[in-house]
Amino acid sequence: IRFNLYAGVSKYAYRLLDYIVEEGKSDDYILLLNIVSENKIREWYPQFKTISIGSQALLKYPMIRTIYLSYDFRRKVNQSGCQAVFCPWGNEITCLKVKPFKISVIHDLQLRLDTKGLLLKIHQIIDDTVVKNSDKIVTISEFSRSQILSFYPNVESKVISLGNSVLMYPDERKRLFKDRYILYVGRICEMKNVMTLIKAYSLIHSQMSDCKLVVVGGRNNYWDNVIEPILKENNIQEKVNLVQNCSEADLTNYYRYADLFVFPSLREGFGSPPLEAAILKTPVLTSIKDSLGEVTRGLLYQLDDPCDEHEMASKMSEILTNPPSEEKLEKIKDELLLHYSIQNVGKRICDYIKNTMLKNSKGK
């Protein structure tokens, strides 16, 4: 289980654990933890028995550490006595063949589309090994399932989409930003298309002088080298606010009090942020690229061309001027919760693990 609280692969694992704890079934599972994250995860989930992998002595040597983690993973799993191993993220650490029945989650293969050269070859080798050494493969959307099969057409019988869940923290209302604001949450990079959002905002900021733009994400080279020059060119540095190291509780409140949430992403295997915003009854304008058309279920305002800043600006202005009714937002919330609640998705995943284990044991 990965420690990073904001990564989609981590959220997937934590929400599943939350469901297992809620159902009182923690005794049925053992957590296999990287030593880097074990103390914090044990603190969060004291209900589980745990096994740790890795070596403190190798923490300063990333390549050697990863190789050791991979072989230690296989060794500890084979010694565990478990009937099956469920890997919430199939990667270079969990890719080797093990004795128990193995179910790996492949969230998407977007990096196979967006990387080149040696890095692409490395991702291909890892993906090939995960697919080869997994008895079943779970993914998070029908889009991702189709993407996996486009690379691995011969594994159709062992790939299934079980969806993903959206979890918001308890209702502790606190307005964190005094002005009206448009919100974006996510990574800051080319494929998330933040540049177009900034350009679109620059077109309407003067007519929406009381409405700022809040970007929740980590500052990086892309922000410094691509976004900052656009802010300076359009003289909107004071109107665009970058929020880093945001807690889940604060993130919930950023969603809740936003006048509009905009998600212009070009690459998504699932796409939680627009769902998280909509479930808190915030108007959402979203791209429908990749999985987003599927997972948003046609319920949200859509961008025909997310790279067209003029279209985006026009639709942002229209929604801010004529926001949807409370009744409409409530209906959207209810519809999304039917499909993405932690209870429904958690049950689906746990039932699949249990039923697959039973079929495997009967087949032996």
What kind of region is each of these model predictions?
Residues 1-364:
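Carbohydrate transferase catalytic cores enriched for Leloir-type hexosyltransferases
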